[in-house]
Amino acid sequence: MTLNLYIYSGLGNIIAIVDSVREDISLDTEDVLNLQENEGVNFDQLIQVLPPQDPEIDFDVKIHNNDGSVASNCINGARCVAKFIEDHSLSASKQLKVNTIGGIWRLESMSEGNYSATFLLSDVIKPICISHEEMYVNLDCISLGNPHGVAFEETNPKLDILKVGKDLQNNSLFPDGVNFGLANKVSSNEINLRVYERGAGETLACGSGACAAAVIGIANKEMIAPVKVNFQLGSLLVDYKKENNMISAIGSAAFVEEIVIES
């Protein structure tokens, strides 16, 4: 069997995409792990693009983290999927509805290599305080199809994102793990963000993490939408409409390479 992997980057978040629309390919957790351990393919998430089961939807996707676990959302991956569909002419439309297990992505191809991903916020923010190495961490938690806990440095100085992120994966408050974001407020509409993703560790960028931090900033930190969220290799512009609970994230997506694996 020949497997073509299309590698994309969403602000440094490496996304491997599998075309299960034109090819009869289905990958499970073991296959995802094998690609890394035996084939030497490195990625943060792997996304299979599938034919839709619902005629009102353009495509379905299945998302795996690099530890093989199934993910419910990946906004950097969503933009990469939009570019992949455009690159391979899988749809003539620049506006798409894509189904994930965490909800519907509304994707749009924009100018200058940018793509937007819009989705419904169906959760509320829950503040919690946890103990970590003889100190307390104040987290605002929210689910965007996947769980997020965000700490702002102004109320949580001197946090080690790697230690806290790893510790949270074993916390009983998060039985399925959690994506941990550490945000630094630059201004009323800009933050710097680092994210420790469950199942992947710290990544160069996390789109859903950016959305979580922006929504929490708007709701609890007197921030003004849209919020520019900066990562090491670029930024996302995140908008949140309280009146309809819709979140949108605009940013770049880039094709990196195609990897062909024979088995």
What are these regions (language model features)?
Residues 1-111, 150-263:
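A glycine-rich beta-to-alpha transition motif near the start of alpha/beta enzyme domains, typified by
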Residues 113-120, 247:
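Short, solvent-exposed secondary-structure boundary/capping segments
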Residues 123-125, 130-149, 246-263:
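C-terminal domain-closing interface element
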